[in-house]
Amino acid sequence: MARLTSILVFLIAFGISIPSQSSPEVAKEPLQSSVKIPSASQWDMRSVLNGHTYRIFVSTPSSSPPPGGFPVIYVLDGNAAFPVAALLARNTESRSAVTGIVPPVVVGIGYPNDEDYDVSARKRDYTISEKKADSSADEGAADEFLDVLEKEIKPAITSAYPINANRQAIFGHSFGGLLVLHALFTRTKSFTTYLASSPSIWWKERILLNELPAFKLAMSDQPAPYIQLSVGSLEDQVRPPSLAGGTQTSVNKRAMVTETHNLASVLQTFPALKNRFHYYELVDEDHGSSWLPAMSRGFRLFLSNQ
């Protein structure tokens, strides 16, 4: 007993801890922090024009801007699409010395929540209507949104970052692709490159196509922008087949591949768009995945035409 007491005194004196057999050590959870995107920032902006709030994401190159400023690409559904676009921009910058391509500023336009897609807000902002929508509309407010983009978001970006106003692109998918085409047909000078991924041409009995004649006429007396139109080859198929039935009927009515292909066939006949219009049917991509290769190809088209 005396020996055990001496050992305990020795251990305590030298600060040596004694493991407890009855209370095994429990591993602590590692400290956690939010994931950050390099060279990126965000803020919320309440529009004076329509009263809605938008979350603006911006990624900037780390290099010095060229004399004319950086090209800029505006990306719709920013909550989901901005991280991918920002990565593509960083990859472009990392290879700039080899390719000679100037990296872009990326501006994601999203909504102040943690969802990838704000279903109700994007339906409101990205869909078109034959008549002007009011501030309480839940759809068909594309023109009001484009006014916000043109008169509020763009000036805010231009005042804060060295932007080349002669090199501006817009990318959108699904309803976002519909908005991109509507902007192309009705506001042809707003951007120099329009990237429409899997556009919802079916919306409201294809009223988008009513804008084609005026667009063709406008193209006869002004420089044509660069255009990319794309769709996934599997977008008209329901997988797995067990989900067919009502779901397949809905997909058939939208006819994403057929409608996009038909529009491409029309645009390819416009003389002003020769060498400026690019159409892709993306093999083995469905509606949920097609925007990823579409964005990658769109970056290439936009940035390679300096």
Task: Please annotate each region the language model reported.
Residues 1-8:
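Bacterial N-terminal signal peptides that target proteins for export
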Residues 15-19:
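N-terminal signal peptide c-region/cleavage motif recognized by signal peptidases
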